[in-house]
Design a protein with these regions (language model features):
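Alpha-helical transmembrane segments of integral membrane proteins
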Residues: 6-10, 66-69, 73-76, 101-111, ...
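Alpha-helical transmembrane segments of multi-pass integral membrane proteins
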Residues: 113-162
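Membrane-helix exit/interface motif
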Residues: 56-61, 65, 81, 85-94, ...
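Interfacial loop at the N-terminal end of multi-pass membrane proteins
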Residues: 3-70, 132
Length: 174
C-alpha cells in the first residue's frame, strides 16, 4: 500500500472515531439525550414503536428537543463517516475477490445501511420538528428502516469476519 493510501485510511478511521464520539458522548450525543429522557437515550439504535417514541420524548422540554434535533444533524455526518469506514474495510478485506456479483453484494451492504440510516434520521428529525404531534405511520416506517439498518450492520460484521478468515485460509494455502 502506498503512502497516500495509508493517509486516506488513517483520515477515514479518524473521521469515523471522532464522529462516533460526537454521536455517543458529544455535546448533543446519545448520553446527553439520555439525561433528558430518564435514561432512554435515542431511539435510532433500538427496536421501537410509536409508544416508545412518545415515552422517550414526553419528559423532554423544548430546549432538550432542540438538542435532540442537533443529535440527528450530527448523526448524518456520522452516517457518512461510518459508511466510508465500512466501505474502506470491505475493500481492504475483500481485495482478493474477483467476482463482480460478490463485490456488489459486499459493497451493497454498507451502502444499504447508509441509505436506511439516512431515511430513518430524516423521519425522526421530522418527528422532532412536529412534536408533540407524532405521525404513527412515519414512526412505523422509520422503525422498519432502523431494523433494516441494524440487520445490515450485523451482516457487515459477519462479512468482514468471513473475509478475514478467507484471507487467512488463502494465505496459509500459499
Amino acid at each position: 500500500m502506498d503512502k497516500n493510501g495509508i493517509i486516506i485510511r488513517v483520515i477515514i478511521t479518524l473521521l469515523f472515531l471522532v464522529s462516533l464520539y460526537f454521536v455517543e458522548a458529544g455535546f448533543c450525543g446519545s448520553s446527553v439525550i439520555a439525561k433528558y429522557n430518564d435514561g432512554f437515550g435515542t431511539v435510532d439504535m433500538k427496536n421501537y414503536d410509536v409508544k416508545m417514541v412518545q415515552n422517550a420524548l414526553s419528559p423532554m422540554n423544548e430546549k432538550e428537543i432542540k438538542v435532540y434535533k442537533l443529535y440527528y444533524l450530527v448523526d448524518f455526518i456520522f452516517v457518512l463517516c461510518f459508511g466510508a469506514f465500512q466501505l474502506m474495510l470491505v475493500n481492504d478485506v475483500f481485495s482478493f475477490e474477483r467476482s463482480k456479483l460478490i463485490t456488489y453484494i459486499i459493497f451493497g451492504v454498507p451502502i444499504f445501511r447508509g441509505i436506511c440510516d439516512i431515511i430513518e434520521n430524516a423521519i425522526l428529525l421530522w418527528t422532532l420538528h412536529t412534536y408533540p404531534v407524532i405521525n404513527e405511520m412515519a414512526i412505523s416506517i422509520s422503525a422498519k428502516f432502523t431494523s433494516a439498518k441494524l440487520m445490515s450492520i450485523k451482516v457487515w460484521i459477519l462479512l468482514v469476519a468471513i473475509g478475514l478468515i478467507w484471507r487467512v485460509i488463502l494465505y496459509l494455502k500459499r
